[in-house]
Every structure is written in C-alpha cells, then in structure tokens.
Design a protein with these regions (language model features):
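Oxidoreductase and adenylate-handling cofactor-binding alpha/beta cores
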Residues: 129-142, 153-165, 195-209, 304
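N-terminal Rossmann-fold NAD(P) dinucleotide-binding loop
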Residues: 13-14, 77
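Catalytic, metal-anchored helix/loop core of enzyme active sites in primary metabolism
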Residues: 142-146, 154-157, 173, 178-182, ...
C-alpha cells in the first residue's frame, strides 16, 4: 500500500484522484492540499484530510509519495517539493517550469535522499516520451529530439490555417473552449514549450538542465497570409521545440518553423502533440497524442505511480547528474537554416534588384520567390525561400534590408526545419 498526498486539486489533481480511486485499490490518498477547504466539490473526499497548509504534506510521516499539481517555477511548489525530498518522499509532478528552473538542484537532492522525481505528466501529457527516452532510446545515441510540445499553439496555428481567422480571434476562441489560459503568455510566447524541450534535451543528451540556454520565439507574430504563402511553397507552419546534438555541442530552441507539408509533424493538428526522436539504431521514432488536459495528464501521473510501485526508482535524468556531460551550447546565431522571408515594399522599379543585391553580397542564395500586390495600395509583397545560411550572416542581411527607405515595416521571417 502506497500512501499519497496531492498538492493542488484543480483539473489535473482531480483527474488523477478519480482514476486512482476507481481503478487502483493498492494506492491510498490520505491528504490533499487545496486553496479553499470550504469549497464544495463534486468529488467525495470522505476519510481524507483536506488542508490549506500545503507544506504539511512535505512533513507528514505517513505520506510516501507526493503528487505536486500546484504549478509555478518557485514559491509554494518549489518549497514543497524540496522539503518533501529532504523528508525522503518520492515526487510525481506535472510541473515543467519548476524542473526547468530548479531541476538540477532538485535532482541532485533526490539522488542524495534515494528518492525519485517522476515527470511524465510535465511533457506532452498523454505521450509517454520521458519513459520512452529514458528506458528505450537513451542508449541509442540520440542525435535529435523535436516536436509539437504545446497544444494551445498547435490549435491556434491549425485554426488560422484552416479557417482563415487571424491570431487574436483564434486565441479568444481557444480561451472560450478551455484550450488556452486567460493569461496565455507562457503558451503563445513559447515559454511552456521551452520548459519541455529543455528537460527533453537534458534527458536525451545527458547534459545538465539549462533553461537559460534555450532560444525562444512564440507564435504571436505569425500572420494570416504566412499560411497561404507557406502552402504555395509546399510547407505548413508549426511551433516546434528542437534539441539537437552535434559532436561535442548541442542546441535547444523553440520557434515557429516551416515544415514540409508531407512530413509527419505537419499532419499533427489542433491540440495534439507530437515528438520525434532520431537515433543511430532505430532511426526515427514518432509519438503522437494529446498533450494536455485533465485526463491525459492525470493518466501520466498514474503511469508514473505504477512504475514507482513496481520498484522502478529511476534516476530522474536517466543517469546521475554528477555524471552529466559538459557539452557546449550552440548559440542560434551559429546555426544554419533555410529561411522564409516576407518583405512589403513600395511597388517601384529597382526595389527587388536592391534586395537581391543585399542577399547576394551576403552570399544568401534564393531557392524560391514570388511577388504580388499588397493589400496596401502602392506596395508589393515579396516572398522568398532561401537556401541554408548561418543565422548571423542572415541577420546582417535582414538588418540591411530593414534599413532600406522603401520597406514598409520590418522584414518577417520564419526558419524552415527538416
């Protein structure tokens, strides 16, 4: 019998509790921490101690497993988890922000106290990516792991493409349907996906967790006509989290990408998530499933609990943090991409030639291009797909183009991937 404490009793905490109560008799929830003890709940909590003092769970000697569903990278969640580990309690959490920011410290503490930190629910909800990488693929020399890691952004991009609605309208729809938070900043700015790819990068490459090294761009600058232009060139637009190893260095980044329309990742729509792992033994492994929501996330917590009950006290990162590799992090300026550019210019003779001269001078070659009249009278929209070029060179060229007098607003660009 495992005695469990649940910190936080929102959608995820309630879903986990319901699944445990219904299907597993060898687990017993003995204490739950909530914000409001007096709040009426549909779930029967008879014979369970309910408290508003969350730190009680960390020191309750009868609790062996703490399920943390509070959220947040610091404050109550951090103090609770740290104290619980010091009291030799196993941790199961859906809190990717906490681990991305404080993971190295907490993992080291967990190893010292011989307890586990399980976090399947923190990354891509219903996709068992942590277990897959840690137990099945880690020793296959993973060279790259990437995917759609935020269901809110994937839903927004899908609806913009399919229904022709602009970003702000789709975001409002997503909020009404519960696919986006009232404050969607962490989702639409790419921060949530960055937390997740940081953890996957550490797990896949055996490097310390380093969120500060993750390059981050969100989806809030993607415009409606970008989808049409991308489609004409054979692409779709997705927000991807990407971690890639190159010899003694690695990179981790989150940004919108143009992906080939016939690729697996391009076909993943709405709130679904997908993760692709590339290694030297199997090649490509693709996992697709629901990335968020009470039931998938609750099920992931249950899966971690079952694993723990079987005696699988896994090292959180697959290897001891003291044996992690010291790989150099690659700055995005030193990475190379093919780029999609959208430039709105005055519709005058010689403007395109000037842009071509700037690209040529910086040794940026054009793969595809088109030009059409802009919605703004007297202006034209030029769209270009380049061949691969290092970002620092590309950035220099874009700065030159932006300084042209006949440019309307700044150049918009999206990197291609794959």
């Amino acid at each position: 019998m495992r005695n469990i404490g649940i910190a936080g009793f929102g959608t995820v905490g309630q879903s986990f509790f319901t699944q445990i109560n219904k299907n597993f008799k060898n687990f017993r929830v003995i204490q739950i921490a909530v914000k409001n003890v007096k709040k009426k709940r549909k779930i029967n909590l008879k014979n369970i101690k309910v408290t508003s003092k969350v730190q009680e769970l960390a020191t309750n000697p009868n609790i062996q497993v703490l399920v943390e569903c509070i959220g947040g990278s610091s404050g109550a969640a951090y103090k609770l988890v740290k104290t619980a580990i010091e009291n030799k309690k196993h941790i199961i959490t859906a809190n990717k922000a906490l681990l991305a920011i404080h993971g190295n410290e907490l993992v080291k503490l967990a190893e010292k106290n011989n307890v586990s930190i399980s976090y399947e629910a923190a990354i891509a909800g219903g996709i068992p990516i942590v277990k897959t990488v840690r137990e099945n693929l880690k020793y296959n020399n993973i060279s790259k792991i990437y995917g759609i890691l935020n269901g809110t952004c994937n839903y927004i991009l899908t609806k913009m493409e399919k229904e022709g609605k602009d970003f702000s309208l789709v975001l409002k729809d997503a909020q009404k349907l519960g696919f986006a938070e009232l404050d969607p900043t962490f989702d639409i700015k790419g921060i949530d996906a960055a937390h997740k790819i940081t953890l996957l990068s550490s797990l896949a490459f055996n490097v310390p967790i380093k969120f500060s090294s993750t390059y981050i761009e969100g989806v809030d600058k993607v415009e409606l006509d970008d989808f049409r232009f991308a489609r004409e060139f054979g692409y779709k637009i997705k927000l991807l989290g990407i971690a890639e190893r190159k010899k003694d260095s690695y990179e981790q980044r989150v940004h919108p990408c143009l992906v080939k329309e016939d690729s697996e990742i391009a076909k993943v729509e709405n709130e679904l998530n997908a993760v692709v792992v590339i290694d030297d033994m199997i090649g490509k492994t693709v996992l697709i499933g629901p990335g968020a929501g009470g039931k998938p996330t609750g099920a992931a917590i249950v899966a971690d609990l079952i694993d723990l009950n079987r005696g699988n006290i896994n090292l959180p990162l697959g290897n001891s943090i003291s044996n992690s590799k010291k790989l150099k992090n690659i700055n995005i300026l030193d990475s190379s991409f093919a780029y999609y550019l959208k430039i709105v210019v005055k519709d005058e003779v010689g403007v395109m030639r000037r842009i071509s001269d700037i690209l040529a001078r910086n040794k940026i070659s054009i793969d595809q291009q088109k030009q059409e009249h802009s919605n703004k009278r007297g202006y034209a929209t030029i769209v270009i797909i380049t061949h691969k070029i290092k970002e620092k060179i590309f950035s220099k060229a874009i700065k030159e183009i932006n300084n042209m007098k006949r440019i309307n607003n700044k150049v918009k660009f999206i990197r291609t991937e794959g």
